A protein has these predicted regions:
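PLP-dependent amino-acid enzyme catalytic core
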Residues: 2-443
């Protein structure tokens, strides 16, 4: 009788001696001596993996991809149940009309926004909440899920946590910079949710979350978990995106992937998929003007910056959390490139794609579309059969940008009315965050 496989461990990118189990990682989102958690080994898929799962549901494909990371901790039956619950919405690859015969006809949009919060982060946050509840729930009757958001993470967190017994979500977001739709999704009144509207930037919110996670006195009161993509569970839950994209293009096609990128978790997940053995011929981080990544790749200099508002607000991040992971998986692995797309180019891409065939991109996906066009104009891009842009959010979440692009804030709409937000307004003040975390608010 064969012995069971050992549970996969995680290691700090900053200290090879710092290791932990999945339970350890959930309880301590950041390693004690800095860095980020990454798996100690990267599982490999066989050459026939995609063919064996070509006609599987997305949930079944995702289960097969993430099983090496979670199955030993959760058990196969529990992992299957988790995937069926968390991934119960469609993930289509859409080719906007009007580009037949041009290089842009090779671009497809992988629509990752058909979950409850209408953004790609539903996949990862729903996974994280379920993994956390099943790994820690018997030992800790009360869990706090803490997140900073520039727009979409917060909505996914509140959707995933609202009404879950023993779980509360505390979400920090910048008072200026999120859209009215995003704020309504994040901060509408409901059980288990505390929304903090911060007089500061997303980077300020993120800094306060990191400070809270490192605060021993807070962590002694009750487990403090992060829903931001510094948590490796979130990133691993996004790895199936690239596998799904690959099976939706023609077998044997040379595929490039363009990822609208802010905190670098999603592009890190694609690079991890490549390290697992998935063939992606080109990978591009499509960023807005706030990202230091293109400069880092071009010059070797990393210069964080204070973010300024752009049309692609969820990517307004000047010091991305997941850089250490991306660099670790890029070193000795397939190449990753990064480009900057400004607001003028973003709005222009939205207009051109809609004018060609009626398809409406969100501003983040439009950043990706422009980067895909630029990739196809290069010598390397000319050899690609397909370029898949990750469609990260539903365009109706950004009525102000739709108004600017089309003169019509209702160019894309959600059904029904969104409720009014009811946040707690605070300054850029960690002590105010501490008071909320120490209270029973939300339970």
């Amino acid at each position: 009788m064969s012995s069971p496989k050992p549970e996969l461990e995680f290691v700090s990118t900053a200290d090879p001696a710092c290791r932990g189990s999945l339970r350890d990682v959930l309880l301590s989102a950041m390693p004690a001596k800095g860095g980020l958690w990454v798996p100690t080994r990267i599982p490999q898929v066989g050459p026939d993996f995609l063919e064996r799962h070509r006609h599987a549901s997305y949930a079944d494909l995702a289960e097969a991809v993430i099983a090496p990371y979670f199955a030993e901790a959760l058990g196969p039956a529990e992992l299957r149940r988790l995937c069926q619950e968390a991934f119960d919405f469609p993930v289509p690859l859409v080719r906007p009309q009007g580009f037949q015969g041009s290089s842009s006809g090779r671009i497809g949009v992988l629509e990752l926004f058909h979950g409850p919060s209408a953004a790609f982060k539903d996949f990862a946050v729903r996974t994280l909440v379920r993994v956390t509840a099943r790994v820690l729930g018997n030992d800790f009757p009360q869990l706090t899920v803490l997140a900073a958001t520039s727009g979409d993470t917060g909505a996914a967190v509140t959707e995933a946590c609202a009404g879950v017994p023993g779980v509360r979500a505390v979400v920090l977001y910048p008072r200026v910079g999120v859209s009215a739709v995003q704020e309504s999704q994040i901060a509408r009144a409901r059980p288990g949710v505390v929304a903090l509207s911060v007089d500061g930037t997303f980077d300020d919110c993120q800094a306060m979350v990191k400070r809270a996670l490192a605060d021993e006195s807070l962590r002694r009161r009750r487990p403090l978990l992060t829903a931001n993509s510094i948590n490796p569970v979130r990133l691993i839950a996004q790895v199936p995106f690239a596998f799904h994209a690959k099976r939706l293009v023609a077998p044997g096609a040379r595929m490039g992937v363009v990822v609208p990128s802010g905190n670098l978790g999603n592009i890190g997940a694609v690079q991890l998929a490549r390290r697992m053995g998935l063939e992606v011929a080109a990978l591009v981080a499509a960023t807005n003007v706030n990202s230091p990544l293109p400069e880092l790749f071009a010059t070797g200099q990393y210069r964080p910056r204070r973010a300024t508002p752009t049309a692609s607000n969820a990517m307004d991040i000047g010091d991305p959390n997941n850089l250490a992971r991306l660099l670790a998986w890029r070193e000795g692995g397939p190449a990753v490139s990064a480009v900057t797309v400004d607001d003028r180019q973003t709005i222009d891409a939205m207009r051109r794609v809609r004018a060609a065939g009626g398809y409406v991109l969100c501003p983040h996906s439009a950043v990706g579309w422009k980067a895909a066009e630029d990739l196809l104009a290069t010598a390397d891009g000319a050899r690609l059969d397909d370029v898949v842009v990750f469609g990260t959010a539903h365009p109706a979440k950004f009525p102000d940008v739709l108004q600017e692009a089309f003169g019509d804030a209702r160019a894309s709409r959600f059904p029904g009315q969104l409720p009014a937000p009811a946040p707690l307004r605070i300054g850029n003040d960690f002590e105010a965050v501490r008071r909320v975390l120490e209270s029973e608010a939300g339970f």
